[in-house]
Design a protein with these regions (language model features):
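Glycan-processing catalytic domains of CAZymes
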Residues: 1-183
């Protein structure tokens, strides 16, 4: 019952807002999991079919019409760029991802033993490469920039002392906006 009430609240308060992301005329709703609702039957009671996008590999828990979005992953010896490219080009309507790198901060931050893997920033090349993957994946519904300002995980796009405006200027180049760093 709470999930239904939460969905109704978000739908009534945010979906009609012109600033809310729409994909193919529908509000885009991402679920980092799912964690609480884990079957298509549970999701069918909460959200209209096709409205929910689960993190990659979890869409079956939401239902056959669920969308998917890619996320930062580099564990198990996975080539993260190849994984993002394969996901982004496998089926239309998916949401791709670009991120600057990843730092396994969990043990240092006091959250267990950590993940045991990291993705190098390579002076901005990781982010640029993933933007290139998105540019060559014409059937993506959207591109998510992960995560904007997660300084612990090193996935920040916001300017820093270490990287300056590297990621923002790369994003400006990618989107083709008419302004640059001076503005």
């Amino acid at each position: 019952a709470q999930a239904k009430a939460d969905w109704a609240h978000v739908a009534n308060r945010h979906f009609a807002d012109t600033a809310y992301l729409q994909v193919a005329g529908e509000p885009w709703v991402g679920v980092f999991g799912p964690i609480e609702l884990e079957t298509p039957a549970e999701w069918a009671e909460v959200a209209p079919a096709g409205r929910v996008h689960a993190i990659w590999g979890e869409a079956a828990e939401v239902g056959p019409e669920a969308g998917e979005f890619a996320w930062v992953w580099g564990g198990g010896g996975v080539d993260h760029v190849a994984a993002v490219a394969a996901f982004s080009q496998a089926a239309p309507g998916r949401t791709g991802v670009a991120y600057p790198g990843f730092k396994d901060y969990y043990a240092q931050g006091g959250w267990g033993d950590g993940l045991g893997w990291e993705i190098a920033h390579d002076a901005g090349q990781t982010f640029s490469t993933l933007l290139d993957v998105a540019a060559t994946s014409p059937d993506l519904a959207a591109l998510q920039i992960a995560t904007w300002n997660d300084f612990g995980e090193g996935t920040m796009v916001e300017p820093t002392h270490e990287f300056g405006f590297t990621y923002l200027t790369a994003l400006q180049d990618f989107t083709g906006v008419a302004y640059g760093l001076p503005e």
